[in-house]
Design a protein with these regions (language model features):
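Internal helix-turn-beta structural module
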Residues: 84-162
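Glycine-rich anion/phosphate-binding loop at the beta-strand->alpha-helix junction
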Residues: 1-98
Length: 162
């Protein structure tokens, strides 16, 4: 979980506001839109990571079918009011050997994060790559939810002309 003070100082908003933004945007909004995934933009992170590491780009659809949750924890003095967020990805199919992972730039990207090759035991590097992608996707979800909850998203787009 993320301490309340960290949420307030880093995101400029409260855990309650982020949890509310998640409910409205990711859960209710996605349901109304008929989406299969209930997340803000996991596909952006998954697609970028897949391209960079030589994954099968066609698997972005499955890899971004994710559910983001956010709730305020009231678990006593140690975690009172902290934000708990998670991202559940049902099927994140990655590999660290063969196919596009042999391309020079993609192999270098796998080297940079220390997951090129099968790993020990075999498959350990693929597991680690999946964890890295999921962690990055959760960070992206929190960033967007924080921007929505603090009303910074629109002003950032106006400032950057996007």
């Amino acid at each position: 979980s993320i301490p309340r003070e960290t949420v307030e100082s880093y995101f400029g908003t409260t855990p309650e506001a982020i949890a509310e933004a998640n409910t409205r945007k990711n859960l209710i909004g996605s349901a109304k839109a008929g989406a299969l995934g209930f997340n803000a933009h996991a596909a952006n992170t998954v697609a970028a990571a897949f391209l960079a590491t030589g994954q099968d780009i066609a698997q972005v659809v499955e890899g971004s079918n994710a559910i983001t949750t956010a709730e305020v924890r009231d678990g006593g003095p140690a975690s009172d009011g902290d934000l708990y967020a998670s991202l559940t990805i049902a099927s994140l199919e990655v590999g660290t050997v063969g196919g596009g992972t042999k391309l020079p730039t993609q192999a270098e990207a796998l080297d940079v994060v220390g997951v090129r090759g099968g790993g020990d035991p075999p498959g350990a590097n693929a597991d680690a790559l999946a964890e890295l992608i999921a962690t990055a996707a959760l960070a992206g979800e929190l960033s967007l939810l924080g921007a929505l909850a603090s009303n910074h998203l629109a002003s950032a787009h106006e400032e950057l002309g996007r």
